[in-house]
Amino acid sequence: MPKNKGKGGKNRRRGKNENEQKRELQFKEEGQEYAQVLRMLGNGRLEASCFDGEKRLCHISGRLRKKEWINNGDIILIQLRDYQNDKADVILRYNVDEARNLKTYGELPETARINETDAFDDVEDIPFEFVAEDDIDIDTL
């Protein structure tokens, strides 16, 4: 067996994906629709609820599969198929800022829930009631 003398494999040579720069907001065109991911099915497929009221099985294209991670609740842009109404292809995933901009421009309905990273900030507001052990009577329990 050869000894490992290197500093890593092909993923290290490839480097990190550092393209966090702002990109131009892409609106839907004819034959495209906005959708929200309901659940990931695996094998490059997901179930999405489109904002036209339909549920569709979507296929993640190869250029998005390893580069952009899609999670439940993400807002995506899908290309509708001409021959299958219940299936579509994922074109683009919007980040939280882009989805918020789409909502302010009126492209997404007001009822659309956008994934927030600070969803659990109000956990501190849960009241707890502490009772002293002297007040508890075992017979009444």
From Swiss-Prot:
Gene3D superfamilies: Nucleic acid-binding proteins
Recorded GO MF terms: RNA binding; translation initiation factor activity
Region (Disordered): 1-28
UniProtKB keywords: Initiation factor, Protein biosynthesis
Occurrences of domain S1-like (ranges): 21-95
Alphabetical list of InterPro entries matching this protein: NA-bd_OB-fold, RNA-binding_domain_S1_IF1, TIF_eIF-1A, TIF_eIF-1A_CS
UniProt biased composition (Basic and acidic residues): 16-28
Stored NCBIfam families: eIF-1A
The protein's role, per its UniProt record: Seems to be required for maximal rate of protein biosynthesis. Enhances ribosome dissociation into subunits and stabilizes the binding of the initiator Met-tRNA(I) to 40 S ribosomal subunits.
Family indicated by similarity: Belongs to the eIF-1A family.
Name assigned to this protein: Eukaryotic translation initiation factor 1A
Organism: Dictyostelium discoideum
Gene behind the chain: eif1a
